[in-house]
Amino acid sequence: DELYPRLNSLTLLARQYDIGINIDAEEADRLEISLDMLEKLCFEPELAGWNGIGFVIQAYLKRCPFVIDYLIDLASRSRRRLMIRLVKGAYWDSEIKRAQMDGLEGYPVYTRKVHTDVSYLACAKKLLGVPNLIYPQFATHNAHTLAAIYSLAGQNYYPGQYEFQCLHGMGEPLYEQVTGKVADGKLNRPCRIYAPVGTHETLLAYLVRRLLENGANTSFVNRIAD
């Protein structure tokens, strides 16, 4: 009763200026309520015919492929093309700790990074398979993952098929190769830059998460893949 009216108001404002809006809760225990709000939003009469509604999914969640199936069905039922931002996930430690504290039989996330990497590619393939219903947004700073998606998407690229995304100030050398011209030996694919905006108090926690997420990627070998 409190959250949805705010979300709806914000989405209507986004439509007024034709700015896409993604629902991103991240934590596994907020997934259901996030999907409930997304479904309600997709059937708002005032938002009919607008393809600026999006959702963020985390590849480290074991439910991720099934969430994608639901999102594809939702896009079909609501007769719109949903933006789906695919990330690997930045709250692994919190998810593991919460599952342990709650005494769960298993974890909601994969416990090995290699499994998350494979999940990301499997989910990317599902998203690319329904271009009429899904606009994939691939958020990654991993060169191996990026190259695999480029290959999965095929060479018959057309504007609006998909996009890559990076965080402001991170992965710039990699994305210079992505957005450069084919004539210069580069990929010529779009990249959206995510730049956080807010107060110092709000941004500090975000910055710490990004530092923790990428703090281990300092060696030369890791930099090749990240």
What are these regions (language model features)?
Residues 1-226:
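Positively charged, amphipathic and often flexible ligand-engagement surfaces
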